[in-house]
């Protein structure tokens, strides 16, 4: 499998996994969602250090993912204090 195809497969799997977690939020608490998101981000950071450049996501893309996750949490949680707490917990 060539490098471009490997990268595409990796990104597709990441997207599917993230979408799957978000669609199950109605069955989970906001804290569980945050923990799952943190695991995904930790995994991405780990991949930054162990994979070739073809697999690396730049820091800007990681921040975009964090921001999208925070916006999603805000839309699905009407308690502003809880949302702000979740955003602080997710963001470095």
Swiss-Prot record:
Stated name of the protein: Non-structural protein 6
Its assembly, as annotated, is: Interacts with NSP2 and NSP5.
Keywords carried by this UniProt record: Host cytoplasm, Host mitochondrion
Q: Which residues form the signal peptide?
A: none
Per the annotation, which location comes first and is thus the protein's main one?
host cell
Q: Which family does it belong to?
A: Belongs to the rotavirus A NSP6 family.
Keyword RNA-binding tagged: no
Q: Which organism is it from?
A: Rotavirus A (strain RVA/Human/Japan/KU/1995/G1P1A[8]) (RV-A)
